[in-house]
Amino acid sequence: MAQQRRGGFKRRKKVDYIAANKIEYVDYKDTELLSRFISERGKILPRRVTGTSAKNQRKVTTAIKRARVMALLPFVNED
């Protein structure tokens, strides 16, 4: 639903990365995939930023939390 704004800028619709690549199971051991959904500080990015569906966002969130407990991903990334 790209809308015309006053400045002539059209907002591009975000695509669900998981659905687009037909990923059925989000594995907590796949840190490369999970790092797409984490900010530089280590926080889980919201749906409005990543464009994932609600169902896939829940899968990603549980996988990230499992990976954090297993020490595959950091809880907080302090620089």
UniProtKB/Swiss-Prot annotation:
Pfam families: Ribosomal_S18 (PF01084)
Taxonomic superkingdom: Bacteria
A GO biological process held by the record: translation
UniProt xrefs under SUPFAM superfamilies: Ribosomal protein S18 (SSF46911)
Sorted UniProt keywords: Ribonucleoprotein, Ribosomal protein, RNA-binding, rRNA-binding
Classification via InterPro entries: Ribosomal_bS18, Ribosomal_bS18_CS, Ribosomal_bS18_sf
GO MF term (any one): small ribosomal subunit rRNA binding
One of the record's GO cellular component terms: cytosolic small ribosomal subunit
Similarity section: Belongs to the bacterial ribosomal protein bS18 family.
Function of the protein: Binds as a heterodimer with protein bS6 to the central domain of the 16S rRNA, where it helps stabilize the platform of the 30S subunit.
Cited PANTHER family: 30S RIBOSOMAL PROTEIN S18 (PTHR13479), SMALL RIBOSOMAL SUBUNIT PROTEIN BS18M (PTHR13479:SF40)
Subunit and partners: Part of the 30S ribosomal subunit. Forms a tight heterodimer with protein bS6.
Record-given protein name: Small ribosomal subunit protein bS18
Species of origin: Streptococcus suis (strain 05ZYH33)
